[in-house]
Structure formats: structure tokens, C-alpha cells
């Protein structure tokens, strides 16, 4: 066996073409590349993992236990994997076969684990049915006694003789030493790993590593003479008391079981179904409507069992259903025809010796007659598959991995058929019975037979659900293993239990608690069925099992009559006296399963006594009780079992079985919850899953929101179930909704009795339990919760809609009060996004206009935008919302325009959907139209139905934006340039404490490289989502109204494909004007030439950055007759053809040329500009210019010039330029970058620009005091100035205080950049001026590189600075050679200063050397600051060197 696992590890492909196709379609990614990359990573992990036969995982129950921490968001259940031989390795999500060592990391929706196992390792000996020691999950240690020792008993008195019998001891049991076994009195029987005591004859098997043969011997056969001769009574007692599980149980209880079946060895294809047992399949045909024993045998041989409906049969392995059987039909052939992938069939057919025997039973006898009225005339209708069998017909079908699930046990076919085949040492009822004893035994055996007959009927397994739900097969829906935790009453520690562990620990009085619909009833019925089937050895110890529903009994009823009425049916009868005698005799061998418990007071006396005085009867009781009813019964319990939330993999398992014909819908369902991880817990009970299935049956088309559909279906279920109490139900929903709504807006999810009373919720009302849960454990007062936080939101949405729709003004006011708690777009799009989705899913003609109006107003209210930073406990409601909040906040900080666009689209979509669903579009139109006026929206909104109904609203919009982002990702940061900029900088010498102020550039580069790799992987796999122009406005033909302005933004995109070109042609033709902004998208323009040529008269703006303009591109641009704005920046080559023909753009208003590295850019402009009279913005960035004449002429021709930017390191003669600029009285912005003019010539004309708003002279130097004073005086005339970048130089330093005083007279100033020239006195002047009321609108104060300011000067500045309510950015950074080491008192002053700046979001302080204590002070200030969520402190340099640490 070891060699099998040690084979050279091949690369395992866990996916197939179907999966690749499905994922590519649904996720719009290149799934093949993603899956191949995952396959490579999995292979590397697989190579490192241990291989070989794992004897410790032979036990299916142990394998099942390994899945306790397994990810619940998977397609396979732990039961399916454990049954297929897999256990969870703990390495990622890897599962491994205990036998062949196959390791799988992925689960597949279309294939079960046994199918994948067989496909990838068909030679696995476990799959081939060989004896590899597999122990079924319900199997037991005790085996049937063997006869072989009777003649050799004397010989085996000698230990050596016993040891010799172990010569062929199986390899998988080597963890238990033959020498220890023989010393304990055991002899190897030669069958699997079964041993038998030579003295008492007791047989034990399923030995695992660590087992103690003496302990096992003492537990199961404590009266053995050999055992008693070797061990003292105290030792035996200690063995028994320390044994885990099986309290009060010995081997006698299993050996003498009345329900015991002879079970074959477990096979992998059994698929966790009891009907893998032929005998049990045969039993299901008791009510078969046809008369032919031979036909039944053929059906059974083909793996089929009878469902109890018409003549529908189902395969225990694949779950396939067939019906309408006729004479001569061949079950095995039809089974193969309709379900060719059935693992059971494949396994049978792989064994040549099976086929002849199988075929001899294939054909149904010709003489088969029917006792039903089924019509078999239509040959084509014979054997409908499960798709063709109506759900109501298939409701009792037992699925392949059903709740009624059990594997065939590891028993040999040749085990003794009789129950009394043991030696004289075994424990059998005495044959010398008195008459009264014989009477009770006879009655008990008869009762056992009747109970087994009742429990094995399909009608017992099936649960009736109301009306529309009755179309569902509850065996499918409620059949998966529930998740159970055990809570011992005397111990607070909780532990997860598998179902086998639960069965092993059944004793005394226990309860199983859970929510409504959690599966309590089905769990009890499952136990009863498994016991009756005889296929669950763990339950063999019970001779009688009584499943009783307590909902229909009265306190005065006798227990015997209850049993007769509920379980024995017509003709069944047992007296109270006889029942009492049986219980008294059997004691621990009687199990009561009590369902629908509501309280001790409602119980008959007999049951009351069984519970409260269990020490008298010593029976076992398992009581199903709703969570809120546990307190009353807790004093009598030994252990409480609690059913936890229904795992998501169980939900998938149910849907896969019921909707195997529509597997893509199931795939979409999984993807929806994969993308919405916060929703994965909403299927918390099987009843919720039933609601999903009902909705799917009623609505075959996909639902946009799976959670909304689920909650609505659940509420519909409640209304159907409680039709007779419609008004009380409505009142309960309203009061619970009020509680939910109040809790939602106070972040409260746990409530006490006072909260319920205040909301009008009756905590004792049964209907309340359908919506809320009560928790009493370890609490002085009970705590109430809704069935889930999302369900609370849903009920809150129902209540809000009810309030806003009310005729009562106070209700409407209350609803509006709650609605206004959503007072910012951030809240609307993050923590309350799901809530608003639920609100919009409840159409209301009265509520819709109110909700729509409120939400649309949020977009533009500046006050509400400021509310985004308030401190709220977001995590309580939606932990996943925190990241979303940060992303939205970051978007708002980086680009308020993009933020507004995003929330506008999303809130508009919610509002329009609400208005349409509630049929209130007309009522909502005034506020919708007001919202649309002057708005820029994304192209996607035009696909909404509203724009098809009202295309005229396009005229109200400012523009529509379309963004195309491709995969041509470009590195934005050039680290070589950064390193070059530090070439002349000497590393500073600092103390070790301050070394953290410098971060090595290689760390940043490495980190960025890793992120780039991740981004690149994502971009490579991502498919561009095609633009959808098939709905809404785009369905109109012809288009009655056009898009007023189309903004096209193209980033990192290559040439457009044919599909995109067709879309753009359609969109361009529907636009009045078009503006382009292209970056890093070479080749794109040429590729959309056909679209541009059709709409060239509409293109008004073209901005191109970091792309290569070919000759063809330039020619194409020159054909745009109405171009008004042209921008070219950061191109490698000079587009001379385009620039030389600028005069052809007759309407050009804006020209921006940003080619910093190119000299003499102006030289390629045309010589004359006779047609350019409309220029409003002129921005030129070049390295040097030797001739300004063309620029001067262009300005002369531009009487409406508003913006002038010029960056140039050298100008040969600037006098003409200054002269012509002086004539431009309408200038709003002037920026000179680079030291490109004589200062005085500009200062002389500065007073002319009275409308100036932006003046940027940061790169200019004013060396003399006279020029600087004149500049300061000129500032006083610029009353509209908003942004000032003060020049540098010694002259400016000398008059700095004068400049500050002049700036204080500028009422509109928002940005002040004053670098390099301030000292202690002048910087203090800024602080004093602000404190006196100046700079009230200042948002950005940049004081960088002012190295003349001392630490004392800074400290005085910090201590005085105040009264700047709008300041957002303060920068006091210095150059590296001028690092400043400050004292604690200065840090304290800085902290106090920051605290006085309520709007501050950025503090720049590079080259300020801070130690850990300083940083702690700064961080403490940040945490207490009003902008704590947004405030960023920049204090670390990123440098290509390490500082010198002084010793």
C-alpha cells in the first residue's frame, strides 16, 4: 500500500473544459489562465505534503471530524468527502485520500468528490472495494461472535498460541500490537481486524492506533472470567468509567439487538445512503403497485428503491428517478441510459464477475401485472428522469447524500446469522424465562417490529410543508448533516460534535435545541429511521425507539395510547401495563425521541416522570426544543445539543440535487454569495433553503438579489403557515419590524424584555419565535436576537416602508425621522446600502417619493459630505463595510468629482428602481429631474428603463462619461529618476533613535513590485466587460434626443476591437459633442477612425498624454473641424505635423503643450494665426525657447485669454511677452515655472491683472529688496486672488513680513505657498495674522524648505497659530541636509497646534527627526482629532541610501 502513495507525483488537473467555460462567462475573466496558475501553485504545495497510506484516517468518523474548521463556502459537504475517503489536511483547503494519498484543493459543482476521486485515481484500492481497513462512520467496535473457537478454546489458553494466530494480521491495523492483543486474551479470527476472546467469546474489531485492548475488553465484556482473573475489580471499573461515550452500554446490547442487519463492507459508491443495502431497498417495495417479485428483485439489483409514490423509483447512489415501468423493461439498461455517470453502475460494470449475475436479473418479467391505474401506453414516456418527475411526485425521494444517510458497515457476509451463536460467556437473554417474562419479551419484539415498519415508510420520512412548499421534497431539503455543538449542563465548555459522536453519547435526558426550521424534527426522524433500517450499528443498542410528537397530545393521555395513535396505526395496540413492564426491563435500551416540546406542564404524567425522574426508568430521552423554551427543562438535562447555522455547502448540496437540470443557475447563485461574502450566513436553517427552492420553482428566471428573494419567500412561508392568524402575524411583523428599525439605527442587535415591550413585541407569542430567537444560557435576563443581522435589516426595511406608507401623520413623521439618519452619501453607499436595497424591494406608492427625494438630496449636500468622518461603530452591522468605507473616503479625498459620479450613478439607480417597482415614476419625476439638471453621469445609467420612458431628460444633463480601462498597465514611478535626484545629497549623520525617519527606496520598490505583480495578474485574467447599449435609452430608434456632451476617458488601452468600435459608433452618433481624454493608449485613435469620421463634427476636445501620435493619428486629428481644446503632454516625439497646422482649428479655445524635455516647441507652430481669435487658455511647457515671437503673436490674437501658463528654463528676451500680457485684462491665472524672466518687468505689469485668481511664481527668484517691495505692494491690488505661490530670493526674505501683511488683505485666499524665505519673525507673523482673523478661507499653507526658521521659531509659530477653520494641509518639510532634531516641548506645541486645526487632513514634516516617543505624541493627537479617519502625517523620506548612525 505504501508504494501506491510514494509514486512519482504527477500534476493533477482538477478542472475541466466545462468549468473553464462557465467561469469565463460568469466572471468575465480568463479562467483558463487563472486555473492553470492555481494548478501550478497547488502542485508545489502537493509535492511538499506527506504521502502514503494513512491508517489514522481509516475511520470515516475521524475523517469527518477533520472538517470542523473547513471553509463552509464550498461545493462539497464534509459527509460527501469523508465517505469518498478524504480527510481535511489543514493545508489550505486540501483534502487527501487515506488510502491512495490523492490530494485535492478544489471542489467542483458538477462532480461529487467520489467522481473526482475515481477519475483521478481509478486504481485506488479503497474505490475498488478492497479491504483497506475503512471504518464506516456508524460502525462499532463490537462484532458478532465467531464459532471457530469452540473446538480450540483449550489451545488458546496459552498466550503464545493466541499470538501465533496473528500471522496474517492486516497491515492497516499494525498500530495495535498483536502481542498486546494476545495478552489481553484475544485471538485473530482471520476476518479483517476482528479478534475474539478465547474465554468469553466476545468479538472486537476496527482497531486503531492508540487503542488499549484491556480497556476495550473491560468496557464491552466486563464479566469475562479471563479478564477478571487478570484485572482487579477496581481496574475494570476504572476502564469502564474512563471510556468515552456509550454510557451504561456493553457488548451484550449490540450482540443481542433485534434490529441488527448483516452488512457488507463499506464501499465508496454507497454515497452515504442507507439504501446501499439491498435488503433495505427490497423492504421499500412492500407497497409496490405491480405484482411481480422478479421485477422487484431486478429493480433492487439495479440500485433502485421505491419512493412510495406511484411507481417512482430512485437510485441510492446518483439520486436519479424513473417511473412508468412496463413489462419487459430492463432496469439496469434504463438506469444506464438516463444516468450514465452513476458511480454505482460504473463500479458494478468495472467488475466482470458481477455482470453475468446482474444481467440475469435485468429484465422485468413479461407476466408483471399492475395493480394501479398508471398509463403505460406511451412508450416514449417510460422512465422519466428526475427532471420529468414533478416535484410533488418526488417529494419523498431519498437523495444520494440525504439526511437519512448512512454507509453500509464493515461487516463480513459470513457473520453468523443467528443472534445466539456465542460461547457460554456471551450475554443473551435466558431461555428459561417465566411466563410473565416471556410475555413482555414477546410484546417488546412485536412492538419493535411495528415501530420499524412505521419508521421505514416514506410517509414517515417526508415532512408536510404548507401549500406552495408542498412541491418540495423535504428529504432533499432537510437531509444534510446539521452542525451540532454539545453543551454539558455542568460545564461551560462547548464542543462541536459529528453525528456519529452524537449517537455514541445518547444517554439519560438530553435535548436538541434550535431555531424554528433548523431541522430538529428531521434530526429526530433521522435517528428513528436509521435505527429501524438496521444499517446504523451505533443505534443497535436500542431495542425500542419511540418518536413522539408532543404538539397534538393532552396532559391526561396515557403513554401507551399516544404510542398507539402516533406510531402503531390501525390494529396496533399495547397496554399501559405491558409498556411499563417493557420499559422497566429494557431501561437504557429504550430511546424516546420527543418532538415539539413546549413545556413540562403540557406533558402527560408518564412523560413528565420519564424526564423529571429519569433515575427511575433509566431510559434515554432526546427532546427537540425551540431555543427559547430550553430554560424550563434545563434542570433535568445531562447534555444539551444545539443545532447551529446551516452550512453554505449544505445549501449548495441541496440546490445541486434539486436543480441539476439548471446547474448554471446554481453556479450563479454561488458566485453571487462569493462576491457578497457578508450574505453567506443568511441560509441559517434548512427552512430558509426551502424558501430559496420554492422561489426558484416559482420563478425560473434569475433573481437580481438572492437575499431579497430568500427573505420574501420565507415571509410568504410564514403567511401560508399561519393563514388562520393573518392579523396577529401582521401585528407581530410590524412590532418586530419596529424593534429591528430602532436597533438598526442604534447599532443594537441584542435586545432585552424592556426593548421588546417598548416596541410592542410579545415575547411569549409563538409567532415571535419565527422572527426572533431567545437566549437564556448563562444569563440573568434573557437576550433576544433576530434570526440574523441581515434579517433584522430586512424587517426594518419592511417597517420603514409601512411607516412612510401610513395614512397617519405621526407614522410618516417617525418614518422620515429614521430615513434622515442616513445623512451622508457614504452611509447610503456603505453601512446602509443593504438596508436601502431591502427598502427598494418593497414597492410603495406613498413611500417611494419620500425615499427618492431624500437619497438624491444626499449627493450634493456639502454638510452631509463632512459627516462622513464622524466616529461610528460600523463593524457591528457590516464588518465588510469598513474597507468599502475607506475606499469611498479615499475616492472622495483624491477626486471629489469621481466620488460624486460614483454615488450619483448608484443612488440614482436605487431611486429609479424604487420608483419603477412602486409605479411612482410620475410622482418622483420632479425631484429626479431636479437631480439630473447639470449633472455628469456614467454611460451605464442610460441603460435604465427611465431613459427609455423619458429620453427628453437627457437635455438636462451636463454630460455623460464613458471610461475605458485596458490592461496596458504602466509603471508610474520612475525610481531611477528618484535616485538621480538624490545623487548630490549627502547621507545625514543622526542618532540611532531617528533612523526610522528614512525608508530605503529598495523596500518601497520591492513592495510596489509585489503589488504590481498582483495587479498584473489580475489585469491579465480580467476580460473587459462589454459596454451594454441594448436597454433603456439605447432601444429608441431613432434617438429623439441626443447626449449633450460625451466625455470619453481611455486609459491603458490598445487598439479597440470590432465589438467596441460598433458600440462607440452608436454612442458617438447619439452625442452632440464629444470630449476625449486619452493616456497610455497608443493606437487607439487610429482604431476608432470609422467612428470618428462619422462624428468628427461633434469632437470638441482632445487631451492626449503618454502616447505616441503617428502620422495617421495627426492627420485624423486635423480632420476634426470643431475642435476647441487640444492638449498634448509627455509624448516621446514632437507632433510637428499637428502643431504646424494648428491654424486649421478655427474654433480652438484651449492649447496645452506639456513637453518639458523638448526645446523650442514653439518653433513648430505656424508663422501666422489669422484664424485663431478665440483662445482662452494657453499653457506651454518646454525646456528652452530662443524665439517668443510666435507666442507673442498668438497672445495678441487672443483678446479673451483667461489662463496663461509658461514653463521654460531660459527665455532669450521676455520684454515683448510682458508687454503683450499687460494687454490681457481678462487673465484669471498666471503661472511661470522655471526662471524665465527679469523680475521687475513682470512686477511692473502685475497691478493690471485685477481679476487674477491664481498667481504661481514659485520658481522665480527676486534677488533685490526694491523689486520685492514693489511685488508686495502690487499684491494688495489683487483682491480676487485665491492661490498665491510666492517667489523666492533674498529680496523676498527681506520683505517677507510685508508680503504676509498684504496677504492678510486678500479675502479669497485659499492657497498660500511661502517657501525658502521665511525666518522666525516672518513665520510668526503668519500665525499672528491668522489668530487676529486673517486667512479665514485658507485651505493649504505650504511652508516647506524654510531653513532659516529655528526650532524656537517653529515652537513659537505652533503656540500662536489658531483660528484657521478651513485649513486642510500644513507642510513644514525641510531638505535632508537641514534635518531638525526637536525637543519634547516643541512636539507638544505641534500637537496642540494640530488639535486647534479642526479641518486638517494632511501634515507634511519631512526631515523632522522624531523618535518613538515623539511619534506616540503625534499619533495620540491624530486619534483625538476631528479628522482622525483622514488625517495623514508625512514624516519619512524614501531615499536610496542609509543615514550615517553616529556612535
Curated annotation (Swiss-Prot):
Binding-site positions, ATP: 520
SMART domains for this protein: BIR (SM00238)
Disulfide bonds: none
CDD domains according to UniProt: BIR
Annotated NACHT domain residues: 508-802
Record's keyword terms, sorted: Apoptosis, ATP-binding, Immunity, Inflammatory response, Innate immunity, Metal-binding, Nucleotide-binding, Repeat, Zinc
Keyword Zinc-finger: no
Residue stretches in coiled coil: none
Alphabetized GO MF terms: ATP binding; cysteine-type endopeptidase inhibitor activity involved in apoptotic process; metal ion binding
GO annotation, biological process: apoptotic process; cellular response to estrogen stimulus; defense response to bacterium; detection of bacterium; inflammatory response; innate immune response; negative regulation of apoptotic process; pyroptotic inflammatory response
Residue windows of the BIR repeats: 60-127, 159-227, 278-345
Annotated Zn(2+) binding sites: 315, 318, 335, 342
GO CC terms, sorted: IPAF inflammasome complex
Function: Sensor component of the NLRC4 inflammasome that specifically recognizes and binds type III secretion system (T3SS) rod proteins such as S.typhimurium (Salmonella) PrgJ and B.thailandensis BsaK from pathogenic bacteria. Association of pathogenic bacteria proteins drives in turn drive assembly and activation of the NLRC4 inflammasome, promoting caspase-1 activation, cytokine production and macrophage pyroptosis. The NLRC4 inflammasome is activated as part of the innate immune response to a range of intracellular bacteria.
Quaternary structure note: Component of the NLRC4 inflammasome, at least composed of NLRC4, caspase-1 (CASP1) and some NAIP protein. Interacts with S.typhimurium (Salmonella) PrgJ and B.thailandensis BsaK.
The name this protein goes by in its record: Baculoviral IAP repeat-containing protein 1b
Gene: Naip2
Amino acid at each position: 500500500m505504501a508504494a501506491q502513495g510514494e509514486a512519482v507525483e504527477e500534476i493533477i488537473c482538477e478542472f475541466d473544459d466545462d468549468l473553464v467555460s462557465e467561469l469565463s462567462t460568469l466572471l468575465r475573466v480568463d479562467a483558463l489562465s487563472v486555473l492553470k496558475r492555481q494548478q501550478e501553485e497547488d502542485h508545489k504545495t502537493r509535492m511538499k505534503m506527506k504521502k502514503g497510506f494513512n491508517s489514522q484516517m481509516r475511520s470515516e468518523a475521524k475523517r469527518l471530524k477533520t472538517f470542523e474548521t473547513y471553509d463552509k463556502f464550498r461545493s462539497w459537504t464534509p459527509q460527501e468527502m469523508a465517505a469518498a475517503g478524504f480527510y481535511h489536511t489543514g493545508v489550505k483547503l486540501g483534502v487527501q485520500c487515506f488510502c491512495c494519498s490523492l490530494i485535492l484543493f478544489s471542489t467542483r459543482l458538477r462532480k461529487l468528490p467520489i467522481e473526482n476521486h475515481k477519475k483521478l485515481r481509478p486504481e485506488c484500492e479503497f474505490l475498488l472495494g478492497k479491504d483497506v481497513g475503512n471504518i464506516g462512520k456508524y460502525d462499532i467496535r463490537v462484532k458478532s461472535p465467531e464459532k471457530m473457537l469452540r473446538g480450540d478454546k483449550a489451545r488458546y489458553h496459552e498466550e503464545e498460541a493466541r499470538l501465533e494466530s496473528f500471522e496474517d494480521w492486516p497491515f492497516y491495523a499494525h498500530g495495535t500490537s498483536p502481542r498486546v492483543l494476545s495478552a489481553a486474551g484475544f485471538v485473530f479470527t482471520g476476518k479483517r481486524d476482528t479478534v475474539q476472546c478465547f474465554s468469553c467469546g466476545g468479538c472486537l474489531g476496527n482497531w486503531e492506533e492508540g487503542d488499549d485492548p484491556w480497556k476495550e475488553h473491560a468496557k464491552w465484556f466486563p464479566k469475562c472470567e479471563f479478564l477478571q482473573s487478570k484485572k482487579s475489580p477496581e481496574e475494570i471499573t476504572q476502564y469502564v468509567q474512563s471510556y468515552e461515550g456509550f454510557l451504561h452500554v456493553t457488548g451484550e446490547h449490540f450482540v443481542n439487538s433485534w434490529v441488527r442487519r448483516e452488512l457488507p463492507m463499506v464501499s465508496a459508491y454507497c454515497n452515504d445512503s442507507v439504501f446501499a443495502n439491498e435488503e433495505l431497498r427490497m423492504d421499500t417495495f412492500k407497497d409496490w403497485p405491480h405484482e411481480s417479485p422478479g421485477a422487484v428483485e431486478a429493480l433492487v439489483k439495479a440500485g433502485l428503491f421505491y419512493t412510495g409514490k406511484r411507481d417512482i423509483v430512485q437510485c441510492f447512489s446518483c439520486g436519479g428517478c424513473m417511473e412508468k415501468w412496463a413489462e419487459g423493461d430492463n432496469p439496469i439498461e434504463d438506469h444506464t441510459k438516463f444516468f450514465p455517470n452513476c458511480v454505482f453502475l460504473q463500479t458494478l460494470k468495472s467488475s466482470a464477475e458481477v455482470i453475468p449475475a446482474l444481467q440475469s436479473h435485468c429484465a422485468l418479467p413479461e407476466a408483471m401485472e399492475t395493480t394501479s391505474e398508471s398509463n403505460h401506453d406511451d412508450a416514449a414516456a417510460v422512465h422519466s428522469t428526475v427532471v420529468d418527475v414533478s416535484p410533488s411526485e418526488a417529494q419523498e425521494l431519498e437523495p444520494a447524500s440525504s439526511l437519512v444517510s448512512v454507509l453500509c458497515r464493515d461487516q463480513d457476509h459470513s457473520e453468523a446469522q443467528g443472534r445466539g451463536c456465542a460461547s457460554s460467556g456471551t450475554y443473551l437473554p435466558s431461555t428459561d424465562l417465566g411466563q410473565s417474562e416471556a410475555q413482555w419479551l414477546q410484546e417488546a419484539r412485536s412492538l419493535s417490529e411495528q415501530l420499524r415498519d412505521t419508521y421505514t415508510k416514506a410517509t414517515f420520512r417526508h415532512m408536510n410543508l404548507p401549500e406552495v412548499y408542498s412541491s418540495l421534497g423535504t428529504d432533499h431539503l432537510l437531509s444534510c448533516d446539521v452542525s451540532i455543538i454539545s453543551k454539558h449542563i455542568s460545564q461551560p465548555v462547548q464542543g462541536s460534535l459529528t453525528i456519529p459522536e452524537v449517537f455514541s453519547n445518547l444517554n439519560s435526558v438530553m435535548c436538541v435545541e434550535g431555531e424554528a426550521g433548523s431541522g430538529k424534527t428531521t434530526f429526530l426522524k433521522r435517528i428513528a429511521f436509521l435505527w429501524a433500517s438496521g444499517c446504523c450499528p451505533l443505534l443497535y443498542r436500542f431495542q425500542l425507539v419511540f418518536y413522539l410528537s408532543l404538539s397534538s397530545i393532552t396532559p391526561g393521555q396515557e403513554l401507551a395510547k399516544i404510542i398507539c395513535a402516533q406510531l402503531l396505526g390501525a390494529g396496533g395496540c399495547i397496554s399501559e401495563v405491558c409498556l411499563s413492564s417493557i420499559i422497566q426491563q429494557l431501561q437504557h435500551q429504550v430511546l424516546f425521541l420527543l418532538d415539539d416540546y413546549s413545556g413540562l406542564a403540557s406533558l402527560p404524567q408518564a412523560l413528565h416522570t420519564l424526564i423529571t425522574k429519569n433515575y427511575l426508568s433509566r431510559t434515554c430521552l432526546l427532546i427537540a426544543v425551540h431555543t427559547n423554551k430550553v430554560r424550563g427543562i434545563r434542570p433535568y438535562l445531562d447534555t444539551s445539543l444545539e443545532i447551529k447555522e446551516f452550512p453554505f455547502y449544505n445549501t449548495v448540496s441541496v440546490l445541486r440535487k434539486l436543480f441539476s437540470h439548471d446547474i448554471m443557475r446554481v453556479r450563479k447563485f454561488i458566485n453571487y454569495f462569493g462576491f457578497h461574502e457578508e450574505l453567506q450566513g443568511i441560509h441559517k436553517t434548512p427552512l430558509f433553503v426551502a424558501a430559496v427552492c420554492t422561489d426558484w420553482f416559482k420563478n425560473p428566471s434569475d433573481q437580481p438579489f438572492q437575499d431579497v428573494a430568500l427573505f420574501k419567500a420565507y415571509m410568504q412561508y410564514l403567511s401560508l403557515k399561519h393563514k388562520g392568524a393573518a392579523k396577529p402575524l401582521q401585528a407581530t411583523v410590524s412590532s418586530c419590524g419596529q424593534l429591528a428599525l430602532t436597533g438598526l439605527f442604534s447599532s443594537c442587535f441584542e435586545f432585552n424584555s424592556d426593548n421588546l415591550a417598548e416596541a410592542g413585541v410579545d415575547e411569549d407569542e409563538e409567532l415571535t419565535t419565527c422572527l426572533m430567537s431567545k437566549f437564556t444560557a448563562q444569563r440573568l435576563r434573557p437576550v433576544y436576537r433576530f434570526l440574523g443581522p441581515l434579517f433584522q435589516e430586512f424587517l426594518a426595511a419592511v417597517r420603514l416602508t409601512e411607516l412612510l406608507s401610513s395614512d397617519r401623520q405621526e407614522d410618516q413623521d417617525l418614518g422620515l425621522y429614521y430615513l434622515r439618519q442616513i445623512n451622508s452619501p457614504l452611509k447610503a453607499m456603505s453601512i446602509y446600502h443593504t438596508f436601502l436595497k431591502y427598502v427598494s424591494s418593497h414597492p410603495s406608492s406613498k413611500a417611494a417619493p419620500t425615499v427618492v427625494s431624500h437619497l438624491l438630496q444626499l449627493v450634493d449636500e456639502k454638510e452631509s459630505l463632512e459627516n462622513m468622518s464622524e466616529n461610528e461603530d460600523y463593524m457591528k452591522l457590516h464588518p465588510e463595510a469598513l474597507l468599502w468605507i475607506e475606499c469611498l473616503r479615499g475616492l472622495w479625498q483624491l477626486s471629489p468629482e469621481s466620488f460624486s459620479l460614483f454615488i450619483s450613478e448608484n443612488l440614482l439607480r436605487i431611486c429609479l428602481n424604487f420608483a419603477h417597482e412602486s409605479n411612482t415614476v410620475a410622482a418622483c419625476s420632479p425631484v429626479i429631474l431636479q437631480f439630473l439638471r447639470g449633472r455628469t453621469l456614467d454611460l451605464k445609467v442610460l441603460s435604465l428603463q427611465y431613459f427609455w420612458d423619458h429620453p427628453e431628460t437627457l437635455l438636462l444633463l451636463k454630460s455623460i462619461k464613458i471610461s475605458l480601462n485596458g490592461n496596458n498597465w504602466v509603471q508610474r514611478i520612475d525610481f531611477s529618476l528618484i535616485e538621480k535626484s538624490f545623487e548630490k545629497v549627502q547621507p545625514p549623520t543622526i542618532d540611532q533613535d531617528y533612523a526610522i525617519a528614512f525608508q530605503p527606496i529598495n523596500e518601497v520598490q520591492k513592495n510596489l513590485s509585489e503589488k504590481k505583480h498582483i495587479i498584473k495578474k489580475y489585469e491579465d485574467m480580467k476580460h473587459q466587460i462589454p459596454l451594454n447599449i441594448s436597454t433603456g435609452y439605447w432601444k429608441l430608434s431613432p434617438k429623439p434626443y441626443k447626449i449633450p456632451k460625451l466625455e470619453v476617458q481611455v486609459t491603458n488601452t490598445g487598439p479597440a476591437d470590432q465589438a467596441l468600435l460598433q458600440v462607440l459608433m452608436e454612442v458617438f452618433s447619439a452625442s452632440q459633442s464629444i470630449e476625449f481624454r486619452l493616456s497610455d493608449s497608443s493606437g487607439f485613435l487610429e482604431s476608432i477612425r470609422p467612428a470618428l469620421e462619422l462624428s468628427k463634427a461633434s469632437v470638441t476636445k482632445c487631451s492626449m498624454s503618454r502616447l505616441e501620435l503617428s502620422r495617421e493619428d495627426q492627420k485624423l486629428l486635423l480632420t476634426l473641424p470643431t475642435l476647441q481644446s487640444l492638449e498634448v503632454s509627455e509624448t516621446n516625439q514632437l507632433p510637428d505635423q499637428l502643431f504646424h497646422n494648428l491654424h486649421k482649428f478655427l474654433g480652438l479655445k484651449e492649447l496645452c503643450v506639456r513637453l518639458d524635455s523638448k526645446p523650442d516647441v514653439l518653433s513648430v507652430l505656424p508663422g501666422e494665426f489669422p484664424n485663431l481669435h478665440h483662445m482662452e487658455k494657453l499653457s506651454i511647457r518646454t525646456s528652452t525657447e530662443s524665439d517668443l515671437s510666435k507666442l507673442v503673436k498668438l497672445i495678441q490674437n487672443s483678446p479673451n485669454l483667461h489662463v496663461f501658463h509658461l514653463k521654460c528654463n531660459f527665455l532669450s528676451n521676455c520684454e515683448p511677452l510682458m508687454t503683450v500680457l499687460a494687454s490681457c485684462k481678462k487673465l484669471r491665472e498666471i503661472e511661470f515655472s522655471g526662471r524665465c524672466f527679469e523680475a521687475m518687468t513682470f512686477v511692473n505689469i502685475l497691478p493690471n491683472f485685477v481679476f487674477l485668481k491664481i498667481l504661481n511664481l514659485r520658481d522665480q527668484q527676486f534677488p533685490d529688496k526694491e523689486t520685492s517691495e514693489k511685488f508686495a505692494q502690487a499684491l494688495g491690488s489683487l483682491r480676487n486672488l485665491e492661490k498665491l505661490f510666492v517667489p523666492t530670493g533674498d529680496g523676498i526674505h527681506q520683505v517677507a513680513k510685508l508680503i504676509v501683511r498684504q496677504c492678510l488683505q486678500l479675502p479669497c485666499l485659499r492657497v498660500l505657498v511661502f517657501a525658502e524665505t521665511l525666518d522666525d519673525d516672518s513665520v510668526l507673523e503668519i500665525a499672528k495674522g491668522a489668530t487676529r482673523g486673517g486667512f479665514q478661507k485658507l485651505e493649504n499653507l505650504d511652508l516647506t524648505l524654510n531653513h532659516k526658521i529655528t526650532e524656537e521659531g517653529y515652537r513659537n509659530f505652533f503656540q500662536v497659530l489658531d483660528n484657521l477653520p478651513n485649513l486642510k494641509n500644513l507642510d513644514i518639510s525641510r531638505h535632508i541636509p537641514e534635518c531638525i532634531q526637536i525637543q519634547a516641548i516643541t512636539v507638544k506645541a505641534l500637537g496642540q497646534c494640530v488639535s486647534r486645526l479642526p479641518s486638517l487632513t494632511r501634515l507634511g514634516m519631512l526631515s523632522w527627526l522624531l523618535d518613538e516617543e515623539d511619534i506616540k505624541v503625534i499619533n495620540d493627537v491624530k486619534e483625538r482629532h476631528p479628522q482622525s479617519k483622514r488625517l495623514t502625517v508625512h514624516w519619512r523620506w524614501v531615499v536610496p541610501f542609509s543615514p550615517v548612525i553616529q556612535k
